[in-house]
A protein has these predicted regions:
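Well-ordered beta-sheet/strand-loop patches within structured domains
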Residues: 18-305
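Compositionally biased, low-complexity flexible segments
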Residues: 5-13
């Protein structure tokens, strides 16, 4: 499963014991639109001030394929409307040509939104699945997180540096459906200030190839020459645990760098520590029962002699 395109939470906050103060963006739809426009403008100003060296597209392909991956476009995600999956297929087909061929020369930055641009109905984008405030909803351009998920998974198998990566706030929103990659390696994007960005800190060029078929979103990560190392990404210590009636998905995602010639492990990096609240029916999950101690119990301890 991959997380879908996220949007900032709209509407009033949920009730609490005391009523929290509303944010400006929660006052009304107009206030929300103003807040989004402000964030977009701020991101453009930041990039202009920093003189960010964005990458561009190149039609000619680099010779070496470092990694390939594909993900099923139409998937069953909880009780979401099937037409949102069909609309996502349209959205991915529109965005893929704008990313395909992205060439990262040394020192350059890949920005998903710099490549794709704004997603509007006028451009043909449709209403797809989004995540807002930890809940499934829909918006124009929804589903594009599947593309950044694909790109991120390929980038993890390379020496490229991820400089901006957002998650869905440690929530497990849908049951696994033909999962191909570890939980927690997904992404969250929203035009243009919640971005996915990668910088090339190496001495050679890399290239992203992204395209769609009838069933799959496909990708390749290419380079000028082969790497002397290979990368393995794996989940460890995964489990579902129930604490005080709430089920969480826990685990770790590790990346191991191995020397191709000797087979020796060169480095091991913790990519993600997962502690995600499960928001779907957990009755079929193999849960470990744990009782979290209350404040009084946590405050007790053995006295020093």
């Amino acid at each position: 499963m991959c997380e879908e395109r996220a949007v900032p939470a709209r509407g009033p906050a949920k009730e609490a014991t005391h009523m929290p103060r509303k944010l400006f963006c929660q006052l009304c739809p107009a206030a929300y639109a103003v807040s989004v426009a402000k964030q977009c403008a701020m991101r453009r100003l930041q990039d202009a001030a920093a003189h960010t060296p964005f990458c561009t597209r190149q039609q000619a392909l680099l010779p070496v394929v470092l990694y390939r991956h594909k993900s099923l476009i139409r998937r069953t995600l909880g009780n979401t409307r099937p037409e949102l999956q069909e609309n996502k297929a349209v959205n991915l087909a529109l965005a893929a040509p704008r990313v395909n061929g992205a060439l990262l020369r040394p020192g350059q930055v890949f920005s998903f939104w710099h490549m794709v641009g704004s997603v509007t109905a006028k451009k043909g984008y449709r209403e797809g699945l989004t995540i807002s405030g930890g809940q499934a909803c829909s918006d124009i351009g929804g589903g594009l997180c599947q593309m950044t998920n694909l790109i991120h998974w390929m980038v993890l198998h390379s020496p490229l540096t991820v400089t901006e990566h957002h998650h869905h706030d440690q929530l497990d929103l849908f049951p696994d459906y033909h999962r191909q990659v570890p939980f927690g390696t997904g992404t969250s994007v929203f035009y243009n200030y919640i971005d996915y960005r990668v910088r090339n800190d190496t001495g050679m060029a890399f290239q992203l190839v992204v395209y769609v078929t009838e069933k799959y979103l496909c990708g390749e990560l290419r380079a000028q020459r082969p790497l002397a190392v290979k990368y393995h990404i794996a989940a460890q210590n995964e489990r579902f645990v129930r604490r005080n009636g709430v089920v969480y998905r826990e685990g770790e995602v590790w990346r191991t760098c191995v020397d191709k010639r000797t087979g020796n492990t060169l480095s091991r990096q913790l990519v993600r520590q997962n502690h995600a609240r499960v928001l779907y029916d957990e009755s079929f999950l193999p849960c470990v029962e744990e009782q979290q101690p209350g404040p009084a119990a946590r405050g007790k301890g053995s006295a020093a002699p």
